[in-house]
């Protein structure tokens, strides 16, 4: 590209100003003689400004190229571009909306408040932090545990927060006064997960002591202990109707339990490593290829319940493992219908998208992945979503956002769109 005379004059003036302001007096004098120009105050600092502008533009170009590449990959994989998606099936997009910093150790759990623009994070630093996820502002710290806080959960009203810890306790917090109102004792080892039942009058917990416990929230009493896993029970979740539980363990299995009877109904054994996480499907999930639900006869059988046991509206269970895979299981038959392969390291957390079409996963490969359930494959990947392993994920039920937490001690808020 050839410069005009005016552009050459401006460039020479900017170079002369740079030599002079940087202390290169001899060079400045010689340059003045050769170009026959004088210092112009209007050109002061121009070369540095142009240089930094080029760097900023280069970064913008690289970001746009990465975005185009990601969209091309998504479309080539059979995904739908953002313009063709409605609000109800919007997917997480880059860049992140907020980066929340303040914890002094790994983030173990993140949980959105069911009503307000608030999110709570739990950390290895033995604290929980409360944030406004719309503004990204830090609000307060909850202290009380004496070891790593492993998990947190809200009841449906959002008035109660439950937390569990490596200090062997579960704590209940009044989320209006932020006071700890009860401490539950009973587990003999690290308490790794806690979940409220839909009614809010009970909660369940899982532990490294290999057990699952059921607690009354009003009294803090343990009313039931479920045993059967042969190693650390990593996670326990509750079905939407509150009749069944699902758990996963270091023993490489996932189990489904009848809550009222305390009986194990199903055991899934096809993972080859620790099962880290699991999720019940929503009632509006799309049809999974090969499912019993693909025929009218199968639907009737599933509704009646396999082996005389009904699983309510949850037709499927998803599990994520350290074997780097995610599996989709049919509850009515106990069959594995799909195995998702794509993560390059442990799968740490999974959530079904509220629209029922997708599963979102995060893992130690630092990526967020979106899986199309009908196609059985990954349609979107956000690589390097964190600078270290991603340990947890949550969906906001009332605002189109997800949150991720990592071993990099930070929480990220991602807008869906």
From Swiss-Prot:
Classify the main location: cytoplasm
Q: Which GO terms describe its molecular function?
A: dynein complex binding
Q: Which residues form the signal peptide?
A: none
Ranges of residues in domain LisH: 7-39
Parts of the chain that traverse the membrane: none
Q: Which InterPro entries match?
A: Dynein_regulator_LIS1, G-protein_beta_WD-40_rep, LIS1_N, LisH, PAC1-like_LisH-like_dom, WD40/YVTN_repeat-like_dom_sf, WD40_repeat_CS, WD40_repeat_dom_sf
Q: Which SMART domains match?
A: LisH (SM00667), WD40 (SM00320)
The domain-related comment in the record is: Dimerization mediated by the LisH domain may be required to activate dynein.
Name the family the entry cites.
Belongs to the WD repeat LIS1/nudF family.
* Protein's recorded name: Lissencephaly-1 homolog
Q: Which organism is it from?
A: Heterostelium pallidum (strain ATCC 26659 / Pp 5 / PN500)
């Amino acid at each position: 590209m050839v410069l005009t005379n005016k552009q050459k004059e401006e460039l020479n003036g900017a170079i002369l100003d740079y030599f002079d302001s940087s202390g290169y007096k001899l060079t400045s004098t010689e340059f003045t003689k050769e170009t026959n120009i004088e210092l112009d105050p209007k050109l002061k600092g121009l070369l540095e400004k142009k240089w930094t502008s080029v760097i900023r533009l280069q970064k913008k170009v690289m970001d746009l190229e990465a975005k185009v590449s990601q969209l091309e990959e998504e479309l080539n994989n059979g995904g739908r571009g953002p313009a063709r998606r409605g609000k109800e099936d919007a997917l997480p997009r880059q860049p992140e909306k907020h980066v929340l910093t303040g914890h002094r150790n790994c983030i173990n759990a993140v949980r959105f408040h069911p009503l307000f623009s608030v999110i709570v994070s739990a950390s290895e630093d033995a604290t929980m932090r409360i944030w406004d996820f719309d503004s990204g502002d830090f609000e307060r710290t909850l202290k009380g545990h004496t070891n790593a806080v492993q998990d947190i959960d809200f009841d449906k009203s959002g008035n109660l927060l439950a937390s569990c810890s490596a200090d062997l306790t579960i704590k209940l917090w009044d989320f209006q006064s932020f006071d700890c109102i009860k401490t539950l004792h009973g587990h003999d080892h690290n308490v790794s997960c806690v979940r409220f039942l839909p009614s809010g009058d009970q909660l369940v917990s899982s532990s490294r002591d290999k057990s699952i416990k059921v607690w009354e929230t009003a009294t803090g009493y343990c009313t039931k202990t479920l045993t059967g896993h042969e190693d650390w029970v990593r996670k326990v979740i509750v079905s939407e109707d509150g009749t069944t539980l699902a758990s996963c363990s270091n023993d490489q299995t996932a189990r489904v339990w009848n809550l009222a009877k305390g009986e194990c109904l199903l055991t899934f054994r096809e993972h080859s490593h620790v099962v880290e996480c699991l999720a019940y499907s929503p009632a509006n999930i799309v049809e999974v290829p090969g499912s019993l639900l693909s025929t009218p006869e199968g639907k009737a059988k599933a509704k009646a319940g396999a082996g005389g046991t009904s699983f309510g509206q949850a037709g499927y269970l998803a599990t994520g493992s350290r074997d780097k895979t995610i599996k989709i299981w049919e509850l009515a038959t106990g069959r594995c219908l799909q195995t998702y392969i794509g993560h390059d390291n442990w799968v740490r957390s999974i959530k079904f998208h509220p629209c029922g079409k997708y599963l979102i996963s995060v893992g130690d490969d630092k990526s967020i992945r979106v899986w199309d359930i009908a196609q059985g494959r990954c349609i979107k990947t956000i690589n390097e979503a964190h600078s270290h392993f991603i340990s947890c994920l949550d969906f906001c039920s009332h605002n189109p956002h997800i949150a991720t937490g990592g071993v990099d001690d930070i929480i990220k808020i991602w807008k869906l769109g």
